[in-house]
Every structure is written in C-alpha cells, then in structure tokens.
Amino acid sequence: MSTSTKWLNEVKWDENGLVPVIAQEASTGDVLMFAWMNREALQRTAETGNAIYWSRSRRKLWHKGEESGHVQKVVELRIDCDNDVVLMKVEQVGGIACHTGRHSCFFQKYLADGRWETVEPVLKDPKDIYS
C-alpha cells in the first residue's frame, strides 16, 4: 500500500476537521451507521482495514468494536461527488453495528400517522455486550 497521504487532501473536511461517514454492509447494502472521522481516523482506517472513527463526545479515536468485539472490516472506501462524505463498505463482524444490540442504528421507521416504530429486533442485550 502506498504511504502517500495526498488522497486525504482531496477530502473536504468541515470546520472541525471532520468528515461524515456512512458505514454500509458490503454483502447486503444495509446502511449500518453514521459517524465521523478526522484525518487520522480515515488514514488509520485505510492503513489497518478496520473502521476507526472520531468520537466527538469523548474527543478521541474510537476503534469500532474495541469494547463490543463488533469490529467493521473495511471492504471498500468511497467518497461522494462533492468529496465531503465518505461511504465505507464493511463486513460487520458479529452482525451487530448498533450499541443498542441491533444490526443497524437505523432501526426506527417513520409511519404515516407521525410515529416512529421500531422495526428491527435487538439481537443481543447491550448489558451482555458491554459488561
């Protein structure tokens, strides 16, 4: 793999030095989650082949699955037409991407009557994941 980081200069980072990232399951096309990366996170993700995000609340790098074991192995990285959103196609180890114990963080569906309905089951109780 090239050690050049010129490709990172093509990313349009926001005023906080971050870029939004969509994690999509490579095998199914399911959107798993949305998160943020800074330059170091994106570079290390590309170098290691494992998803590493930037936690805005903790102000540090977050290795997806470091506590849960539900790592994301990167299959492909793409950038959108404006160079300001990253799409990361991944293999979701363990089948759980969400801290709620679900496959996807997008488990609530809007209904015509103005309610959100949970449409995906909890695959594993979060207490059993993070204990």
From Swiss-Prot:
<keyword id="KW-0378">Hydrolase</keyword>
<keyword id="KW-0963">Cytoplasm</keyword>
<feature type="binding site">
    <location>
        <position position="105"/>
    </location>
    <ligand>
        <name>Zn(2+)</name>
    </ligand>
</feature>
<dbReference type="GO" id="GO:0004635">
    <property type="term" value="F:phosphoribosyl-AMP cyclohydrolase activity"/>
</dbReference>
<dbReference type="GO" id="GO:0000287">
    <property type="term" value="F:magnesium ion binding"/>
</dbReference>
<dbReference type="Pfam" id="PF01502">
    <property type="entry name" value="PRA-CH"/>
</dbReference>
<dbReference type="GO" id="GO:0008270">
    <property type="term" value="F:zinc ion binding"/>
</dbReference>
<feature type="binding site">
    <location>
        <position position="82"/>
    </location>
    <ligand>
        <name>Mg(2+)</name>
    </ligand>
</feature>
<feature type="binding site">
    <location>
        <position position="84"/>
    </location>
    <ligand>
        <name>Mg(2+)</name>
    </ligand>
</feature>
<comment type="function">
    <text>Catalyzes the hydrolysis of the adenine ring of phosphoribosyl-AMP.</text>
</comment>
<comment type="similarity">
    <text>Belongs to the PRA-CH family.</text>
</comment>
<keyword id="KW-0862">Zinc</keyword>
<feature type="binding site">
    <location>
        <position position="80"/>
    </location>
    <ligand>
        <name>Mg(2+)</name>
    </ligand>
</feature>
<dbReference type="InterPro" id="IPR026660">
    <property type="entry name" value="PRA-CH"/>
</dbReference>
<dbReference type="GO" id="GO:0000105">
    <property type="term" value="P:L-histidine biosynthetic process"/>
</dbReference>
<dbReference type="GO" id="GO:0005737">
    <property type="term" value="C:cytoplasm"/>
</dbReference>
<keyword id="KW-0479">Metal-binding</keyword>
<feature type="binding site">
    <location>
        <position position="98"/>
    </location>
    <ligand>
        <name>Zn(2+)</name>
    </ligand>
</feature>
<dbReference type="InterPro" id="IPR002496">
    <property type="entry name" value="PRib_AMP_CycHydrolase_dom"/>
</dbReference>
<keyword id="KW-0368">Histidine biosynthesis</keyword>
<keyword id="KW-0028">Amino-acid biosynthesis</keyword>
<keyword id="KW-0460">Magnesium</keyword>
<comment type="subunit">
    <text>Homodimer.</text>
</comment>
<feature type="binding site">
    <location>
        <position position="81"/>
    </location>
    <ligand>
        <name>Zn(2+)</name>
    </ligand>
</feature>
<dbReference type="InterPro" id="IPR038019">
    <property type="entry name" value="PRib_AMP_CycHydrolase_sf"/>
</dbReference>
<comment type="pathway">
    <text>Amino-acid biosynthesis; L-histidine biosynthesis; L-histidine from 5-phospho-alpha-D-ribose 1-diphosphate: step 3/9.</text>
</comment>
<protein>
    <recommendedName>
        <fullName>Phosphoribosyl-AMP cyclohydrolase</fullName>
        <ecNumber>3.5.4.19</ecNumber>
    </recommendedName>
</protein>
